[in-house]
Structures are given as C-alpha cells and as structure tokens.
Swiss-Prot record:
Residues 257-269 are periplasmic. Catalyzes the transfer of 4-deoxy-4-formamido-L-arabinose from UDP to undecaprenyl phosphate. The modified arabinose is attached to lipid A and is required for resistance to polymyxin and cationic antimicrobial peptides. Residues 1-235, 291-327 are cytoplasmic. The keyword Cell inner membrane applies. Belongs to the glycosyltransferase 2 family. Keywords: Antibiotic resistance, Cell inner membrane, Cell membrane, Glycosyltransferase, Lipid A biosynthesis, Lipid biosynthesis, Lipid metabolism, Lipopolysaccharide biosynthesis, Membrane, Transferase, Transmembrane, Transmembrane helix. This is Undecaprenyl-phosphate 4-deoxy-4-formamido-L-arabinose transferase. The gene is arnC.
Amino acid sequence: MFDAAPIKKVSVVIPVYNEQESLPELIRRTTAACESLGKAWEILLIDDGSSDSSAELMVKASQEADSHIISILLNRNYGQHAAIMAGFSHVSGDLIITLDADLQNPPEEIPRLVAKADEGFDVVGTVRQNRQDSLFRKSASKIINLLIQRTTGKAMGDYGCMLRAYRRPIIDTMLRCHERSTFIPILANIFARRATEIPVHHAEREFGDSKYSFMRLINLMYDLVTCLTTTPLRLLSLLGSVIAIGGFSLSVLLIVLRLALGPQWAAEGVFMLFAVLFTFIGAQFIGMGLLGEYIGRIYNDVRARPRYFVQQVIYPESTSFTEESHQ
C-alpha cells in the first residue's frame, strides 16, 4: 500500500507498576506471541517504581537462558507514559509495540499489529471491542477521547488503549521532544503521516486493581488539556471580554434609564453597583488570561527536567549497567 522499510525486528515495550501477579502470565503469553512472528524480537519491561516484587521477577526473567527480555528499573514512579519513553530509549527494533501489563489487551493481538504495520503505516492504533471496564471508566474514556479529537483534530477512535505499534522513525522523533508531560498516542499521531486503527479484544482484569483512580483520571484530563494547547487560556480571555462588554453595556443602559425614569427606578444604585462589579470582574478575567498565556509560554520554555531516572538496565545473559540519569 505504501512504500515503507521492511520490518526486521519487533520490540515490545511494557510498563510495569505493581503487577507481580500478572507478570508470569504476561511474559509467557507475550513471548509466545513474539515467537510466532517469524522475525527477530525483544521484550522491554520497565519497572515504574513498583513497591511489590515486580522488579525482582523482571530481573529473574532477563537472566534466564535464551531470554529476550530487557528489564529497565526506574528509581521511583514517574507514570505510565514516562516509563514507556524510558523503554523507547533502549529499543533496537524497526517496529515498537506498546502493551499494558494488566493483560486486558491480549498479547495475542501483537501479530495483527505487525501485519498491519507491514502494509506501510507509521502508527497502528487499536480500538477496544466489548470493553470490560466499569461504566465510570468507559464514560471517562469517551470524554477524554472527545476532548483529544476536538483539540488535535485527529479523529482516532480510542486514544486510551495503549496496545499500539509505532515505526522506528516515529519513536526517534518523539525521543527528541522534551515535554515533561507526554501523552504518547497523541504525540505519535502528530508526527505520523500514515496512521490507522484496528479493532482488538478486551478482557477483564484478572489480577489486582486498575492504577487509574478517579483523581488520576482527573489529573490525566488536566494534563491533556494543558500540554496539548493554550486554547483554555485564550477562552479565558474571551470570556473576560464578553463579561466586560456586557457589564459596560449594562452600565450605559442603567445610566440612560436613571436619567429617563429618575433615581427611584435604579433601587438606590444597587443595579449600577452590579454593573460596575461585572465590568471589573471581566477585566480581571482578561488580565488573568493574558498573564496565564505568558506564564504558559515561559513554563513551556524552561521545563527541562528529566522525564525519568533510569537506575539500572538488565540485559539478557546477566549483563547490566547502571545509568546516572536519562532524558
């Protein structure tokens, strides 16, 4: 369909946070899926500061004979997308697939993503069919997807599903970006010329609980809005302008009515007081919006802290090294 480089090696990047119960099954099923590809492959497990024995299980898997697993240990919890970016910085494949560790997205779908990417697509997204999440999670996901589509203009069906495939040039370009708040599916679609989606199965979570609580979903929505666009700041200025104009118009109207009908009509100046108050409130919104615009631009320029700190990388055959910092 498109002229694209052939896929010779596949890298599967999986962020892990307190998933000790699902890890053995995850590794077994992901390994089986990769072995069926007929291509070179590797699995990168990124421990995002787990407090259980996830890191120990990962290291053990990397040190087994004939292992294809690279374990990356972060010093603390940085969040799902930062952990994935840490994995991206260590991949060696031509096609990189991201996968959650909770097994709700079956690893058996990996060959389908590889086959679709082989058609020449830069990014292959997925849409979860028959979602097994709670009504709250489904509703929140719909709101977030709608928000992203309206903000970016990219009509993708399911931005929340992390089972996705990216060609290497897209990964390399994302690694050159230095935003601290990164939402990978959106960032990838900004750089992808050829993107598509395929339907995938969605299973119930067998082990543990979801890591996205109500407050984390709220924080995610806020991060999406603030990292994608400055439109809310402009809307704040627009709202302030409307209120200020309305307040000024009301003030003029009240002055005219007071002169025409007499002071008794104006309730001893109460209406005039509200008109003046609305005018000043509107002016304050305008000032806050402009100030926020400048602060937002300054913040975007100066936030240069690392996204994450890689404490240790364990390669197969028991080789390892320690990094002081990364990205």
